[in-house]
């Protein structure tokens, strides 16, 4: 540590500080001439800013949960809550004899397509009313259908 002590003095406005060596300037005293013209200043800042490419989204692009974050692929799956005030769903029976139910497996505590066979492995098909049904893929397994709107110039790939 040094044995130097510092003294802070407040000078009245307008008085000159004779010893400029220990003075910290917080504002510039004078503005350079090339920065004094506002038009030149805006041109200089415009040159510094790089032009970013603008992305144009088509109508079929996913708006990520109405947050105005456009994405070309699904990163989260949002399922809005259903109204349970409807009397149609509340009369639903969870018994095995109710075959007219089209409810998902997670309402019964299970999952679609996760039934286990006698050997303990996953069955590829689920038996309902004696008929084997294909399991419905969940939203992460389902591959959306994309429209290929790109067009090749005439003369390329005409063998089709």
Swiss-Prot record:
Location of the protein in the cell: Nucleus
Main localization, broad class: nucleus
Domain of life according to the entry: Eukaryota
Keyword rRNA-binding recorded: no
MF (Gene Ontology): protein phosphatase 1 binding; protein serine/threonine phosphatase inhibitor activity
Biased composition (Polar residues): 1-10
Region listing for Disordered, in residue ranges: 1-160
Biased composition (Basic and acidic residues): 30-43, 82-97, 105-114, 122-135
A GO term from the CC aspect: nucleus
Residue ranges crossing the lipid bilayer per the database entry: none
Ranges of Basic residues composition bias in the record: 44-55
Keywords in alphabetical order: Nucleus
Role according to the record: Regulator of type 1 phosphatases which maintains protein phosphatase activity under strict control.
Family label: Belongs to the YPI1 family.
Annotated protein name in UniProt: Type 1 phosphatases regulator YPI1
This protein's encoding gene: YPI1
């Amino acid at each position: 540590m040094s044995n130097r002590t510092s003294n802070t003095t407040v000078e009245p406005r307008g008085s000159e500080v004779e010893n400029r060596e220990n003075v910290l300037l917080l504002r510039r005293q004078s503005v350079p001439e090339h920065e004094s013209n506002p038009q030149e200043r805006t041109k200089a800042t415009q040159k510094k800013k790089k032009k970013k490419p603008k992305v144009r989204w088509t109508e079929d692009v996913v708006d990520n949960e109405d947050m105005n974050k456009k994405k070309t692929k699904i990163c989260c799956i949002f399922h809005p809550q259903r109204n349970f005030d409807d009397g149609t769903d509340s009369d639903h029976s969870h018994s095995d004899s109710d075959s007219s139910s089209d409810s998902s497996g997670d309402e019964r505590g299970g999952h679609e397509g996760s039934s286990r066979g006698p050997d303990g492995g996953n069955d590829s098909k689920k038996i309902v009313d004696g008929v084997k049904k294909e399991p419905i893929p969940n939203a992460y397994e389902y591959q959306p259908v994309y429209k290929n709107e790109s067009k090749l110039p005439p003369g390329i790939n005409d063998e089709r």
